[in-house]
Amino acid sequence: MKYFKSALRLGIVLIIICGLIYPLFITAVGQTVFHNKANGSIVTFKGKEVGSALLGQNFTDKRFFRGRVSSVNYNTYTKNDSNKDEVASGSQNLAPSNKDLKNRVKKDIDDFLKTHPGVKKDEIPTDLLTSSGSGLDPDISPKAAEIQVPSVSKATGISQSKLKQIIKKCTEGRTLGVLGEERVNVLKVNLEVASMLKNSKIGE
């Protein structure tokens, strides 16, 4: 009986600490010190929420920079979409020899070359043709952004030098100076572009 009471008291104490005090403490710290990140890093434009800095989007308008390929369509579907994958994130995990993967990459290459005249096949950065493990990657490499500058400049009338400045402004360095690579947040870049356009669909 003595051991039972001790175990019961210990269980109650742990429930209070781990199930109440700790979660409330972490929530309080998150909401006060990291409020934006704790709430999904939501990005606003013209007073409207237009996305998250942590989640990629499928930009098809030729006036904007495109992001990485997503095997789950960035988890955005219509009710009648026959291609709905029923998964929130992930990758197809297809082998390099898989025919479906080869066909998809070929289609993406042809599409990119068509919309970016002057670019050669072997100049297309790998991250514009491959999907991330989650299918929701919001970033591309600086090289992947810069190769799109001529096309975006032509579609928007914004000078290439100005677009390169925007890319530089939205480029983040390695985490802690050593982890990962330099990256450009596609949503943030496109919002900078949208702010310079008279008519933009972003946020409308």
Curated annotation (Swiss-Prot):
InterPro entries: KdpC (IPR003820)
Keywords associated with the record: ATP-binding, Cell membrane, Ion transport, Membrane, Nucleotide-binding, Potassium, Potassium transport, Transmembrane, Transmembrane helix, Transport
Disulfide bonds: none
A GO cellular-component term linked to this record: plasma membrane
MF annotations from Gene Ontology: ATP binding; P-type potassium transmembrane transporter activity
Subcellular location: Cell membrane
Start and end residues of each stretch annotated as Disordered: 81-100
Keyword set includes Ubl conjugation: no
Family per similarity comment: Belongs to the KdpC family.
Oligomer and partners: The system is composed of three essential subunits: KdpA, KdpB and KdpC.
Matches recorded under PANTHER family: POTASSIUM-TRANSPORTING ATPASE C CHAIN, POTASSIUM-TRANSPORTING ATPASE KDPC SUBUNIT
Known function: Part of the high-affinity ATP-driven potassium transport (or Kdp) system, which catalyzes the hydrolysis of ATP coupled with the electrogenic transport of potassium into the cytoplasm. This subunit acts as a catalytic chaperone that increases the ATP-binding affinity of the ATP-hydrolyzing subunit KdpB by the formation of a transient KdpB/KdpC/ATP ternary complex.
NCBIfam families named in the record: kdpC (TIGR00681), PRK00315.1 (NF001454), PRK13995.1 (NF010600)
Entry protein name: Potassium-transporting ATPase KdpC subunit
Naturally occurring in which organism (per UniProt): Clostridium acetobutylicum (strain ATCC 824 / DSM 792 / JCM 1419 / IAM 19013 / LMG 5710 / NBRC 13948 / NRRL B-527 / VKM B-1787 / 2291 / W)
Lineage: Bacteria, Bacillati, Bacillota, Clostridia, Eubacteriales
